[in-house]
């Protein structure tokens, strides 16, 4: 099963995303409110995808992305942001983001963004 981590400072948003993902058959391994919690939980968790917010009250999601890709380059990262700014999108891509999802998004957008990042499996 594909394992997902949710990293956002909004507990409400994390809970809503978790409900959608789990009802769609995904396993949410853990949630984190920031980088310290993310890095304390991710090693050995088997996470294949991190949904990562870009804006936090005390840190920058792009910095978290850079650190995550440096330490765990195989983990896919889907950035989540409410700001549609070309420079931010370009920087996220440069740092290794595997996709960007813009808030507000609906269930179909969330699931299709994740499905694009799933490992391809032969049937």
Locate predicted features.
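Two-component/phosphorelay signaling modules centered on CheY-like receiver
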Residues: 11-30
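C-terminal output helix
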Residues: 87, 105-115
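Acidic catalytic/metal-coordinating carboxylates
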Residues: 34, 60-63
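Alpha4 helix (beta4-alpha4-beta5 surface) of REC/receiver domains from two-component response regulators
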Residues: 63, 84-99
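The feature encodes the CheY-like receiver
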Residues: 57
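Short amphipathic alpha-helix used as the core "switch/output" element in two-component signaling
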Residues: 62-74
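Acidic, metal-coordinating helix/loop segments flanking the phosphotransfer/catalytic sites
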Residues: 31-49
């Amino acid at each position: 099963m594909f394992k997902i981590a949710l990293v956002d400072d909004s507990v409400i948003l994390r809970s809503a995303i978790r409900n959608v993902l789990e009802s769609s058959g995904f396993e949410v391994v853990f949630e984190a409110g920031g980088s310290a919690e993310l890095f304390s939980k991710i090693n050995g968790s088997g996470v294949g995808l991190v949904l990562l917010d870009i804006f936090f009250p005390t840190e920058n999601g792009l910095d978290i992305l850079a650190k995550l890709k440096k330490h765990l380059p195989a983990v896919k990262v889907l950035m989540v942001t409410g700001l549609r700014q070309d420079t931010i999108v370009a920087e996220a891509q440069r740092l290794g983001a595997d996709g960007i999802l813009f808030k507000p998004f609906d269930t179909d957008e969330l699931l299709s963004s994740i499905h694009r990042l799933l490992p391809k499996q032969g049937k």
